[in-house]
Regions:
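Conserved lysine of the Walker
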Residues: 60
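Conserved nucleotide-sensing/catalytic segment adjacent to the nucleotide-binding pocket
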Residues: 84-127
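N-terminal pre-Walker A segment at the start of P-loop NTPase domains
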Residues: 5-8, 12-41
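Interdomain motor-coupling "hinge/lid" segment immediately C-terminal to the ATP-binding subdomain
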Residues: 13-14, 131, 137-252
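Accessory nucleic acid-recognition modules appended to NTPase machines
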Residues: 24-25, 203, 207-312
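Hydrophobic anchor at the beta1->P-loop junction of P-loop NTPases
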Residues: 52
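Sensor-1/coupling segment of RecA-like P-loop NTPase cores
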Residues: 119-140, 282
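Hydrophobic positions on the alpha1 helix immediately C-terminal to the Walker A/P-loop
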Residues: 63-64
Length: 312
């Protein structure tokens, strides 16, 4: 959950949360071009299907719809999932690429879609998007050779427009010379963007509205999303305190032990094993991501960092 502050995980007044949720989840807005658009097009031209994964509200559905020619949303109604169970082929029929949104609500579709791709022998057939990884199922094929995985995250400053995009990783990799690069953003502006977060729905909202949204998002995670996605009942108070600790320690090599100590300092004792279970649950809904330690050339004698950095 990039760019959110520890304060965003505190509980907002219930009426404010409800009003903000209606405003931000219900509004329609013009599509914002995303960094993954080009890669999604390339993957659709080379694979039978693409699986878009990422946290709720990061823009997966909008991006999928932008590239799809037909779609079905499994979270619209319980009857849609029932239809998928009774007649899976009805869900798969439509112009291609066909978007199947929140597919993890009907995980049995995975093997059916995989076989459909094999039968059609065509590329760019399906786009699957989901805000939670389905539980492990030994019967489910990996999808290798049929599906490409595409990870989406909240928007970068370039996507949300505050950045001038004068510097990019591709230009640095190409050894392009960078001269006269200047940004009008102040430290205050950057702090405001960090509080706002990279959610597409918040692009034109005030900082106050953004804080309400982020508080609501965290509250939904602790009260509903995690249990629905993992089947595990978590202590909402401990989970919220862990999330606050993760926000404080984001982009660091924090360990389960250090996080447990940090949470304990807030007055809630919790052991390392429980912390690990909670971290795994947050990873399932893509609210937490571990960045592997950077590895230099194998021939280099430079000492490698071994611990992953956590991003929340």
């Amino acid at each position: 959950m990039d760019n959110t502050s520890a304060n965003s995980c505190t509980k907002a007044p219930q009426t404010a949360v409800q009003n903000r949720r209606k405003l931000l989840y219900g509004q329609k807005m013009a599509y914002i071009e995303r960094a993954v658009d080009t890669r999604l097009e390339r993957l659709l031209s080379s694979m039978g299907g693409v699986l878009i994964e990422g946290p709720r509200a990061c823009g997966k559905t909008s991006t999928g719809l932008q590239h799809a020619k037909s779609s079905i949303r499994l979270d619209e109604s319980p009857t849609v999932v029932q239809l998928a169970e009774l007649d899976p082929q009805a869900v798969l029929q439509g112009d291609t690429p066909r978007l199947i949104d929140e597919w993890q609500l009907a995980p049995f579709l995975w093997n059916i879609i995989r076989h459909e791709i094999d039968d059609r022998q065509a590329r760019g057939q399906f786009i699957l998007s989901g805000s939670a990884a389905p539980t492990d199922d030994i019967r489910r094929h990996s999808g290798a050779g049929r599906f490409a995985r595409l990870r989406m995250r909240p928007m970068t400053l370039t996507e949300s427009r505050p950045s001038t995009a004068q510097v990019s990783l591709s230009s640095i990799s190409a050894s392009e010379q960078l001269t006269g690069v200047h940004s009008d953003l102040t430290y205050k502006d950057l702090a405001a963007e960090a509080v706002r977060g990279g959610w597409p729905a918040l692009t034109n909202e005030s900082i106050g509205d953004a804080m309400d949204f982020n508080a609501s998002y965290c509250a939904d995670l602790t009260s509903t999303d995690l249990q629905v996605s993992t089947g595990i009942r978590h202590d909402p108070v401990r989970m919220r305190r862990l999330m606050e600790s993760l926000a404080r320690n984001t982009a660091t090599e924090a360990t389960s032990g250090s996080l447990a100590s940090d949470v304990a300092a807030d007055g809630s004792g919790i052991d390392r094993n429980t912390i690990r279970i909670y971290l795994d649950s947050l990873s399932v809904v893509f609210a937490l991501e571990e960045q592997p330690a950077w590895a230099v050339s194998l021939r280099s004698r430079t000492r490698l960092r071994k611990a992953a950095k956590i991003h929340f």
